[in-house]
Each structure stands twice: as C-alpha cells, then as structure tokens.
UniProtKB/Swiss-Prot annotation:
<feature type="binding site">
    <location>
        <position position="92"/>
    </location>
    <ligand>
        <name>Zn(2+)</name>
    </ligand>
</feature>
<keyword id="KW-0963">Cytoplasm</keyword>
<dbReference type="GO" id="GO:0032580">
    <property type="term" value="C:Golgi cisterna membrane"/>
</dbReference>
<feature type="binding site">
    <location>
        <position position="174"/>
    </location>
    <ligand>
        <name>Zn(2+)</name>
    </ligand>
</feature>
<keyword id="KW-0479">Metal-binding</keyword>
<feature type="binding site">
    <location>
        <position position="97"/>
    </location>
    <ligand>
        <name>Zn(2+)</name>
    </ligand>
</feature>
<keyword id="KW-0333">Golgi apparatus</keyword>
<feature type="binding site">
    <location>
        <position position="169"/>
    </location>
    <ligand>
        <name>Zn(2+)</name>
    </ligand>
</feature>
<dbReference type="GO" id="GO:0046872">
    <property type="term" value="F:metal ion binding"/>
</dbReference>
<feature type="region of interest" description="Disordered">
    <location>
        <begin position="1"/>
        <end position="23"/>
    </location>
</feature>
<comment type="function">
    <text>May play a role in membrane trafficking, specifically in membrane budding reactions.</text>
</comment>
<keyword id="KW-0813">Transport</keyword>
<keyword id="KW-0472">Membrane</keyword>
<protein>
    <recommendedName>
        <fullName>MOB-like protein phocein</fullName>
    </recommendedName>
</protein>
<dbReference type="GO" id="GO:0005737">
    <property type="term" value="C:cytoplasm"/>
</dbReference>
<comment type="similarity">
    <text>Belongs to the MOB1/phocein family.</text>
</comment>
<keyword id="KW-0862">Zinc</keyword>
C-alpha cells in the first residue's frame, strides 16, 4: 500500500467510529490534498486546528482562486450555523419570537415564501439555511466547485446578508446562547471578518459588535 493510498484510507470515518476519534487524523499540507474538494478540506482542517485563529482560517493558499475561496467559506459558514440553529431551539419559539428581529428598528421578511413575509424567528432561521444550501448546491449557479463564474459569485452577497440575520437575532434576543456558541466556535467573528474582507455586506448592516473596531465604536456611541 502506498503512502497516498494509506492517507486516503485513514482519512475516513468508518462505521462505529467513536466520537473521540471522529475526524481525528493528522493534518495534511494543502499541496498533498488530492481531493476535488481540497479547498473545503483545507478550510475545515484549519478550523479544527484553532477555531479562534480567524486570520489564518481566512488566509487562502498561494494562487487560490478568490471566487472559489469565498464560495467554499460561505458553504462552511452555513454548515456550522446549523449548530447555532440547534441551540436556538431551546428558547427561540414562535410564541416568544413571533418575528425575525434584531434591534427594534430591524424586522426581516422571509424570502422563502411566494411573497416575502414575516416568519417566526426559528422558522426564518430554518428557511434561510435551507435556502442558502439550495442555492449553494445549485447546478444552475454552481455546477462546479473548481471554476465558478463571476455571475454566480455575485449571489454570495445576498446569501451572506440573510444568514447574518441569524447571528443578529441570537445576539440581541438570546445572548446567553449566542455567547455559548461564539465562545466555542468564534463563528460570528469569523463571518464578520469574512464579509468585511470581501465587501459582501455594508458596514452599517453589521450590527453585532464582535470585532474590536465595532466594540470601540459602540463604546464611543454610548459615551
């Protein structure tokens, strides 16, 4: 058995794999990743190494196509956001969160309906993540994860804006759950850094004060 074959065999979670051993394999250099999904593999490996190291996670390998890099990160954000959605189910129920809101001036309409409509926050969260998964896995817009057309890349901004609302609702209405999730994953910090780096959202829409400059600005406003 060659070393390459051994790597391909070991880097799988077989039937009956214990939780402690799940994905518990040695890291690979990006150049050694021969999978067609090497960018996803690289991103997930970097997150696993240290989820708090946002700068390293968002730094692409040399000569990496920017469109593919942005696309794969957004897919990964949506995957991880399911963890926050699961936590929110503890207390974010239609009876208490009848609308998808953040601060008092923000009420978000759900695009999953025939006509955009108000939705209970937990339903909005589910609909948004389902819609994002459908778009990002669409053969029409993303037939390849190796070469992505610019017209398809333009869709990423609308996905980013919608999924960010999940963070903002959790922060302003379920702060304890938000902090529990963020302290473990640093996902909102990574997402905010990502959309700022690639100009996928306007700064005034980034209302969760998660980055140092946002926190400083909030303190100045309060004073």
């Amino acid at each position: 058995m060659t070393a390459a074959t051994e790597n391909r065999t070991v880097r799988r979670n077989g039937p009956g794999t214990k939780r402690a051993d799940w994905n518990n394999w040695s890291p690979l250099a990006f150049e050694e990743m021969d999978s067609a999904l090497n960018i996803q593999q690289y991103i997930q490996q970097t997150i696993k190494a240290n989820p708090a190291d946002v700068a390293t996670i968002l730094t692409p390998p040399l000569d990496q196509d920017e469109g593919v890099w942005k696309y794969e990160h957004l897919r990964q954000f949506c995957i991880e956001l399911n963890g926050l959605a699961l936590l929110l189910q503890r207390e974010c129920i239609p009876e208490t969160c009848q609308q998808m809101t953040a601060t008092e001036q923000w009420i978000f309409l759900c695009a999953a309906h025939k006509n955009p409509n108000e939705c209970p926050a937990i339903d909005y969260t589910r609909h948004t993540l389902d819609g994002a998964a459908t778009l990002l896995n669409s053969n029409k817009y993303f037939p390849s994860r190796v070469n992505i057309k610019e017209i398809s890349i333009s869709k990423l901004g609308s996905v980013a804006r919608r999924v960010y609302r999940i963070f903002s609702h959790a922060f302003f209405h379920h702060r304890k759950l938000f902090d529990e999730f963020e302290n473990e994953t640093h996902l909102c910090k990574r997402f905010t850094t990502y959309v700022s780096k690639y100009n996928l959202m306007q700064q005034e829409h980034l209302i969760v004060p998660i980055l140092p400059n946002q926190q400083q600005q909030q303190q100045t406003t309060v004073q």
